[in-house]
Amino acid sequence: MIASGRHQWTNDYPAEHDIKDDINNGNAYVLTVDGEVAVYGAVALNGEPQYDFIDGDWLTTGDYYVIHRFATLPSFQREGLARIFISKVNSMCEVEKIPSIKVDTNFDNTPMINLLSSMGFCICGRVNYGGNRGQRFAFEKLSIAMEPAE
């Protein structure tokens, strides 16, 4: 991420302890290809306190899954695997009746912005992490279709 000139992450984030915390909390998910990890993401239920302070408006106010520390290994990029990972998170939402997925990304992370936009995520505003992490675009996607009342 840093090598590509994007400011999504810093030299100290994410750190090894962040990934270990994801694993210990049951939030670490991987997509594998032939037994090799291709995509990693931390997926947590209602797992981002900063989202309570959005400069904007979320589509929903209920439960959500958040995806953090989302990365595709370079040797697997441009194969559609990030899209598959997010689709699987959407399936988790449908099974568990969680109405949406929320994600934030840095303003210069064009590949992620394009991926989210192409998958039906809406930009809802900005969240501010302060310090080196600063502001991020905040995205949300509804995962369960609304049905008319009868």
Model-derived features with residue positions:
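Conserved catalytic-core motifs of GNAT/GCN5-like acyltransferases
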Residues: D104-T105, S117-F137
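Conserved GNAT acetyl-CoA-binding A-motif
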Residues: I86, C93-T105
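Conserved GNAT-fold acetyl-CoA-binding loop/helix
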Residues: M1-D21
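Residue-level recognition of the GNAT/N-acetyltransferase active site
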Residues: H68, L73, D104-N106
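Conserved beta-strand-loop-alpha-helix junction that forms the acyl-donor binding cleft
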Residues: Q77, V103-I113, G130
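Conserved beta-hairpin
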Residues: N27-A44
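Conserved acetyl-CoA-binding loop-helix of GNAT-fold acetyltransferases
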Residues: T72, R78-S91, N114-S118
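Conserved acyl-donor/pantetheine-binding loop and adjacent beta-alpha core of acyl/acetyltransferases
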Residues: A42-R69, Q77
